[in-house]
Amino acid sequence: MTKENICIVFGGKSAEHDVSILTAQNVLNAIDKERYQVDIIYITNDGEWKKKDNITQEIKNTDELVINDVETGEISQLLSKGSLGKSYDAVFPLLHGPNGEDGTIQGLFEVLDIPYVGNGVLAASSSMDKLVMKQLFEHRGLPQLPYISFLRSEYEKYENNIIKLVNDKLTYPVFVKPANLGSSVGISKCNNEEELKSGIAEAFQFDRKLVIEQGINAREIEVAVLGNDYPETTWPGEVVKDVAFYDYKSKYKDGKIRLDIPADLDQDVQMTLRNMALEAFKATDCSGLVRADFFVTDDNQIYINETNAMPGFTAYSMYPNLWKNMGLSYPDLIAKLIDLAKERYEDKKKNKYKIDY
């Protein structure tokens, strides 16, 4: 059997650089190398692209993926399908955060006319920006917690007014979040005005736009979605924390979380969550994969929190474990995602790009 040529892209110029490398390690160790020939492209923190061909060995340490011993390559040469480079059946971007999960890299693949795993430009960019995402959810009629949003320039000019708005509209605790980051980078739980100001200063180090959300005493429930025009969902899973909130350190450093799969919820609540996950998927025009995150209160009130257009594949990650519970193994999940990328690419080829006069 002729192997399909796959290129995995990871790293990136983002605060989530290390998370991306960890995700790449998991995917590289899970992908079926009898079916796929796998090349990798590592993007450094400075934005340089480094490529290695035909990865066959197990990656035992993430340091093995930090490529420093090859020359920086031209992007078009590394990826193009013409005479400048190898023809790839699909590219698998495992980039988290800005410059990778926000539609920018997807736009590059579109221009180069290469099939790629995951969401397109619109879905990736709207899922990355928490404010845009919330506005799309609101238009779809999905229930959300109260929030406000503002820019760094607005806060510098109207700090007192914005603090007053938070105090008037929301009640403590609140969560301060950069609008365009994931993996809980830059997020703070604030219990009073002093902590609020500190949290705002922290979050503005990572983004020019913030979202401040109402805190709630609720369970954190997640649903995985897989597919293109006819997506499927998993039974929900629950993030059980031994910390105040599910931040970057507890996710990737301390291991102070547990994933309960499936979550202990009434059947009707589980079905509602699955249906809402599909609605969120459609609201942002997603394709390939999404993880939809929810809050569920003790009286079974459900609020959508966000969708993650490129959920992690680390040992702690919910997305692959939710599909494992449904009977879909890591290798089969990866193969399915690659097939979905090719399916979407073939569908796009049906579009006309010139007008017949």
UniProtKB/Swiss-Prot annotation:
Its chief place of residence is cytoplasm
Keywords from UniProt, A to Z, are: ATP-binding, Cell shape, Cell wall biogenesis/degradation, Cytoplasm, Ligase, Magnesium, Manganese, Metal-binding, Nucleotide-binding, Peptidoglycan synthesis
Which pathway does it operate in?
Cell wall biogenesis; peptidoglycan biosynthesis
**Gene Ontology cellular component annotations, sorted alphabetically:** cytosol
Q: Which residues bind Mg(2+) 1?
A: D293, E306
Q: Which Gene3D superfamilies match?
A: 3.40.50.20, ATP-grasp fold, A domain (3.30.1490.20), ATP-grasp fold, B domain (3.30.470.20)
Q: Any keyword Nucleotide-binding?
A: yes
Location in the cell: Cytoplasm
Catalysed conversion reaction: 2 D-alanine + ATP = D-alanyl-D-alanine + ADP + phosphate + H(+)
UniProt-listed Enzyme Commission number(s): 6.3.2.4
Give the enzyme class.
ligase
Stored SUPFAM superfamilies: Glutathione synthetase ATP-binding domain-like (SSF56059), PreATP-grasp domain (SSF52440)
- Listed binding positions for ATP are 167-222
A molecular function (GO) term: D-alanine-D-alanine ligase activity
Q: Which cofactor does it need?
A: Mg(2+); Mn(2+)
BP term (GO), one: peptidoglycan biosynthetic process
UniProt-annotated binding residues for Mg(2+) 2? E306, N308
**Similarity comment:** Belongs to the D-alanine--D-alanine ligase family.
**What HAMAP family does the annotation carry?**
Dala_Dala_lig (MF_00047)
What does the protein in this record do?
Answer: Cell wall formation.
Q: What is this protein called?
A: D-alanine--D-alanine ligase
- According to its UniProt entry, this protein's organism is Staphylococcus epidermidis (strain ATCC 35984 / DSM 28319 / BCRC 17069 / CCUG 31568 / BM 3577 / RP62A)
Tell me the gene name.
ddl
